[in-house]
């Protein structure tokens, strides 16, 4: 596992965007051989999406031959709702870059057959071989995507019941009214994430410090689903300074020394 220790959320967003752009450009995608990118929603990736849009407008990257798969979507929320992840992604990213509509894959939380929707999503991912880079965030309780604590580390795309804590955290997007937050969501599984060639998780804020500690210094544990990344051959945690407050000093020093060259120029 790599840990990229930065200072601010803006630096995290810029580093993550730069890494994505470097991966896409090194891959040299074509229509027949697209780069497959997994994407999250929420507050954490906002600085990354902003930086990606800026880099696209500056001519540093094209998304014409990039295929995307989003992590999750609420169940029962109309896709036109401003807080659906369909709306979020178009508002904050897709509408500002040159990605073709047919290359965008989002779970349908209003599908008449939820189980079939989840199976088809997994099948479509497999049809591309694999996701080359899956970007994500982490919840205060260590969940990735909507894989809440005690999720199977072998799980695939499915419907999940959201914990009260997750709904409270997400209520900030729903006028701070937890009753407006859907109780269920479709989400890729932990196993789906682990199948990706590379997984990059961004960690922001002191409220995520225990989750980061569990991911880096703890044991692999389904109560902290983020800890599954210890099993991944190419996992990256990109974090700001407040999120590292629970890490041991020697742990942080170790990763600062390892990544000194990779965090320059931000």
Swiss-Prot record:
A GO molecular function assigned to this protein is: identical protein binding
What cellular-component terms does GO give this entry?
cytosol
Query: Which Pfam families does the UniProt record give?
Result: Glucosamine_iso (PF01182)
Nuclease found in the keyword field: no
Q: Which PROSITE patterns match?
A: GLC_GALNAC_ISOMERASE
**Which chain regions cross the lipid bilayer?**
none
The EC number of this protein is 3.5.99.6
Q: Which reaction does it catalyse?
A: alpha-D-glucosamine 6-phosphate + H2O = beta-D-fructose 6-phosphate + NH4(+)
- Which top-level enzyme class is recorded in the Swiss-Prot or TrEMBL entry? hydrolase
What pathway is this protein a component of? Amino-sugar metabolism; N-acetylneuraminate degradation; D-fructose 6-phosphate from N-acetylneuraminate: step 5/5
- Entry annotation: catalytic residues: 72, 141, 143, 148
Give the UniProt keywords, A-Z: Allosteric enzyme, Carbohydrate metabolism, Disulfide bond, Hydrolase
Regulation of activity: what does the record state?
Allosterically activated by N-acetylglucosamine 6-phosphate (GlcNAc6P).
For this chain's UniProt record, which GO biological process terms are given? carbohydrate metabolic process; glucosamine catabolic process; N-acetylglucosamine catabolic process; N-acetylneuraminate catabolic process
Question: Is Lipid biosynthesis there in the keyword field?
Answer: no
Cited InterPro entries:
Glc/Gal-6P_isomerase (IPR006148), Glucosamine6P_isomerase (IPR004547), Glucosamine6P_isomerase_CS (IPR018321), NagB/RpiA_transferase-like (IPR037171)
Q: Tell me which residues are marked as the site Part of the allosteric site.
A: 151, 158, 160-161, 254
UniProt similarity note:
Belongs to the glucosamine/galactosamine-6-phosphate isomerase family. NagB subfamily.
Q: Its biological function?
A: Catalyzes the reversible isomerization-deamination of glucosamine 6-phosphate (GlcN6P) to form fructose 6-phosphate (Fru6P) and ammonium ion.
Subunit-level organization: Homohexamer; trimer of disulfide-linked dimers.
Q: What is this protein called?
A: Glucosamine-6-phosphate deaminase
Q: Which organism is it from?
A: Shigella flexneri
Taxonomic lineage is: Bacteria, Pseudomonadati, Pseudomonadota, Gammaproteobacteria, Enterobacterales
